[in-house]
Regions:
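Soluble metallo-hydrolase cores and metallopeptidase-like ectodomains found primarily
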Residues: 1-32
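Solvent-exposed alpha-helices and their adjacent loops that cap or buttress functional pockets
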Residues: 8-16, 39-41, 61-65, 102-106, ...
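Alpha-helical metal-binding/catalytic segments enriched in His/Glu/Asp
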Residues: 22, 32-73
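Glycine/charged-rich beta-loop-alpha catalytic/anionic-binding loops adjacent to active sites
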Residues: 25-37, 121, 194-195
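Acidic, glycine-rich active-site loops and adjacent beta-strand->loop/helix elements
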Residues: 26-29, 69, 73-80, 191
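Short acidic, glycine/serine/threonine-rich loops at helix termini
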Residues: 34, 80-87
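A glycine-rich helix N-cap at a beta->alpha junction
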Residues: 86-112
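Active-site-adjacent substrate-binding region
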Residues: 100, 110, 116-250
Length: 253
């Protein structure tokens, strides 16, 4: 599913406001017939589509954002499960390369990637893990009313699936298919919850994630929400060259 909500000065209308992508990441909404009901893993799609619906309603009511917003995700009610430590992963009937090709749109100039991140013990541009932008932390504080929380990543989390390395989850897999900056929004819990667990969706958490993406979209279209410091990024590349190798399969056979 891909939804384009045109902005008043969006590029789809001939304008020059930047385009934000909101990607809902998941294996599936359900694990039928093994499990009955919606699974925890589907929260990313639910949040992304909630954001899309709200943007469409706002647009119809005359509250039009400056820039285009493209929301993309996929719906699968009967996805398989996979063994994974410490709890089972939800698999998907489509591979990550296909998912990225369909969901990571080249028109997206920055991406908010929303994914359930409950099945672990912890709560990028061109292969670099960059500092979290102050603008995004300001939005998070405003939306949640709490201090911003940042989840830890390892370098291998931003490498493509299929290279036999452990990945936190698919939250930053869009980085492997774009040159745009990608920020992961993790829907997390205090205790580990398997992606295939039913009855584990917390409506308030999904709503906060959707509202965060919407608030970022409002600011991004005006140019007042930076995902990273462009001068620092340029100097980083000048000193250490690019890290695009991490967006590839490397020397995997």
């Amino acid at each position: 599913i891909k939804v384009l909500i045109p902005g008043s000065n969006g590029k789809s209308q001939g304008g020059d406001a930047p385009t934000l992508g909101v990607v809902g990441r998941l294996g599936g909404l359900g694990a039928r017939p093994e499990l009955i009901g919606a699974v925890s893993d589907g929260d990313g799609a639910l949040a992304a589509l909630t954001c899309a619906l709200k943007l469409v309603e706002m647009h119809a009511a005359g509250d039009v954002l400056p820039g285009d917003v493209i929301v993309a995700t996929h719906i699968c009610p009967d996805a398989p499960t996979l063994p994974h430590e410490p709890v089972p992963f939800m698999d998907s009937p489509i591979d990550m390369e296909t998912m990225n090709r369909m969901e990571v749109d080249p028109r997206m100039e920055a991406i908010v990637s929303i994914d359930t991140t409950k099945g672990n013990r912890i709560i990028n541009v061109n292969g670099y893990i960059l500092p979290v932008a102050n603008d995004l932390m300001d939005v998070m504080t405003r939306v949640t009313g709490k201090m911003p929380q940042v989840f830890a990543l390892s370098q291998q989390d931003i490498t493509p699936y299929g290279n036999d390395l452990y990945h936190l989850n698919s939250i930053l897999q869009p980085t492997t298919a774009t040159t745009a900056p990608v920020v992961g929004v993790a829907i997390a819990t205090e205790q580990m919850v398997a992606g295939c667990a039913t009855g584990a969706t917390h409506g308030s958490d999904v709503e906060e994630a959707a509202r965060f993406a919407l608030e970022v979209a409002k600011l991004f279209g005006t140019g007042s929400c930076k995902f990273y410091d462009e001068e620092q990024w340029a100097h980083l590349v000048e000193l250490y060259v690019t890290m695009e190798r991490y967006q590839t399969m490397g020397d995997a056979k």
